[in-house]
């Protein structure tokens, strides 16, 4: 915490902490790492952590309910928090516990099964996707474990592409990558400024968009 406050070690807070080491978390982590981001994955399941490490991902065995990461100076460049477990209680708790120290630039969680059924209960901010819960995302990764990039030529192109992806059950929109290579999470309540040359990043079945 001291390091984060005084900036002794911190050069930038663009690292990402992902709670949960499922196949969905791992494919997201590998993509972001390939694009130059530092990603740390935590999970209380030893086997899942070992699978992440085997994929070349920095991973720690951590129980969010009992383990404290706030004093870990090796995580002082983390500024984004993604809670991607299949347990909504763990996701909610992780956001509450870690967002102050590791989510200063953004903290996002998966929606619960109940929120998927009753979308009026989904908060306006802080969710990774408003249309896909852990089960849906896991099925997409199982059947189509691929991430695609589409170069956009206009905001109209973005809107038509999002519509096409949302209509395809086996595809999920993830990020907008700007010209500087920075990734912004797509949610239906996000006001994104789209420019020609931006890239739309999506998971799953490849579409002609």
Regions flagged by a language model, labelled:
Residues 1-209:
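Cytosolic regulatory regions of ion transport systems
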């Amino acid at each position: 915490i001291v390091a984060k406050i005084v900036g002794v070690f911190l050069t930038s807070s663009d690292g990402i902490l992902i709670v949960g080491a499922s196949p969905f978390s791992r494919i997201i982590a590998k993509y972001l790492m390939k694009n130059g981001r530092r990603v740390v994955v935590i999970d209380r399941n030893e086997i899942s952590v070992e699978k992440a490490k085997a994929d070349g991902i920095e991973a720690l065995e951590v129980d969010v309910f009992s383990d404290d990461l706030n004093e870990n100076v090796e995580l002082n460049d983390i500024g984004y928090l993604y809670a991607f477990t299949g347990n909504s209680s763990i996701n909610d708790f992780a956001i509450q516990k870690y967002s102050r120290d590791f989510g200063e630039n953004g903290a996002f969680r998966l929606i619960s099964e109940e929120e998927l059924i009753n979308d009026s209960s989904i908060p306006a901010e802080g969710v990774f996707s408003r249309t896909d819960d852990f089960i849906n995302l896991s099925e997409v990764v199982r059947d189509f474990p691929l991430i695609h990039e589409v170069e956009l030529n206009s905001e109209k192109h973005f809107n038509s592409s999002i519509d096409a992806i949302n209509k395809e059950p086996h595809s999920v929109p993830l990020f907008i990558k700007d010209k500087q290579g920075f990734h912004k999470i797509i949610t239906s309540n996000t006001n994104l400024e789209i420019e020609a040359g931006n890239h739309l990043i999506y998971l799953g079945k490849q579409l002609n968009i």
